[in-house]
Amino acid sequence: MKKYFIGGLGSNVYHSKDFLQELDSQVYFLNPYEKHLRDETELKSWFKNEIVEEESICLIGHSLGGDLARYLASEFYEVTKLILLD
């Protein structure tokens, strides 16, 4: 199972580096904010391109990233685990 992390608005891989290194496996950082996505269709298309047909995904989201992760989990059957952080 591949793990992905979506941080809050304005965050980047450096903000979550220490947290992600504490986890027991590799976690890939996703940054939807740099793409200036305008709607749900663009968000879903971006996510589909990022996950590259994984069979099973754990999606971790923090703050606004948690809201996005929750929505994406409801739209993609590949997301089998969802972790929301505040």
What positions do the PLM features span?
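Gly/Ala-rich beta-loop-alpha elbow adjacent to hydrolase catalytic centers
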Residues: G61-G65, A69
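Active-site signature of alpha/beta-hydrolase-fold catalytic machinery across serine-
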Residues: D18, Y71-E75
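Short, charge-rich binding segments
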Residues: V52-E53, G61, S74-F76
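Structural motif
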Residues: K2, S56-C58, K81
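Active-site catalytic motif of lipid deacylating hydrolases and related acyltransferases
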Residues: M1-E54
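A conserved short beta-strand
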Residues: E78-D86
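Short beta-strand immediately N-terminal to the catalytic nucleophile in serine-hydrolase-like folds
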Residues: L59-G61, L85
